[in-house]
Amino acid sequence: MAQPDDAALPFSLLQFYATSPYPCSYLPDREARSQVATPAHLIDSEIYSSLIRTGFRRSGIFTYRPHCDGCKACVPVRLPVTELRPNRSQRRAMKHHAKLRVRELPLVYIDEHYALYNRYQQARHPGGGMDEDSHEQYAQFLLQSRVDTRLIEFSDDEGIRMVSLIDVLDDGLSSVYTFYDPDIPDASFGTYNILWQAAQCQALGLPYLYLGYWIANSRKMAYKAMFQPIEGLIDGHWLALPKLEKT
C-alpha cells in the first residue's frame, strides 16, 4: 500500500503555518491548533488530493490538519469502499431511504438549504456557534471551494431532507459536510449518506471515501467507527483499524 510522504508534498509551491491555540470543538477543556496550507489559490484538485492523503481537510477555501501540542486524538480515517460491509441497521437505513430523490446542484446559495442548515445546527449543535451562522458565514463555510466540489440534495414529496458537500479526489471522495432534517426521529440520514457516498465511489471507480477525523473519546465522531472496515492515518501510514469501537 502506498504511504503518504510529507517530503513529496509541493513545498516549493505551498507554505504551512500553525494557528494560535483555540478551544477544541471535540474534547472539553482542551486547546487545539491547526496547520494551514497556503496560498489557497494554488491548491487545486491534484494538490488537494495529495494533502488529503496526509491528513488535511478543507473548510471553505482553507486547507488544514490538526497540529495540537501534545495531542494526537484526531485520527484521519477513510473507508476502502470495495471492502465495506454494512451491518443490519446500516442496510435498513439504505432500504428506508432508497426512494429519496437525488440532485447534483451548482455550488450556489439556496434559501431552503440555509433554512435546513440552521434547523440542523440548532437541533444537533446548540450553543456551538454554528447555530448562529449568517448567510455569509454559511456560504463561506460550504459554498466556497477551489477544488472539484459537488453539492448533493436529497428530497422527497415533503421537501428537502438532506444536503451533502463532497470533494472529488484522484483516489476517492472526501465527505466535506452534511446536514439533514433533524425533526424526523431515528431517520439515520447520516448513515444513509455515508453508504450513498461509498456507492458513488464505487460507481466512479474510486477506492476510498475520506471521512475526516475520528476521535475515540468524542461522541460527535463515534458514528464513523460503525463502518467497517476502516483505515486510519497513524504516524504517516494508512493502517486497517478493525477494532474501532463506538464510544
Swiss-Prot record:
GO terms for cellular component: cytoplasm. Keywords: Acyltransferase, Cytoplasm, Transferase. It catalyses: N-terminal L-glutamyl-[protein] + L-leucyl-tRNA(Leu) = N-terminal L-leucyl-L-glutamyl-[protein] + tRNA(Leu) + H(+); N-terminal L-aspartyl-[protein] + L-leucyl-tRNA(Leu) = N-terminal L-leucyl-L-aspartyl-[protein] + tRNA(Leu) + H(+). It holds the Pfam family ATE_N. Its EC number is 2.3.2.29. Coiled coil: none annotated. One of its GO terms (biological process) is ubiquitin-dependent protein catabolic process via the N-end rule pathway. It is found in: Cytoplasm. One of its GO terms (molecular function) is arginyl-tRNA--protein transferase activity. Belongs to the R-transferase family. Bpt subfamily. Functions in the N-end rule pathway of protein degradation where it conjugates Leu from its aminoacyl-tRNA to the N-termini of proteins containing an N-terminal aspartate or glutamate. NCBIfam families: PRK01305.1-1, PRK01305.1-3, PRK01305.2-3. This is Aspartate/glutamate leucyltransferase. It comes from Dechloromonas aromatica (strain RCB). The lineage of its organism: Bacteria, Pseudomonadati, Pseudomonadota, Betaproteobacteria, Rhodocyclales.
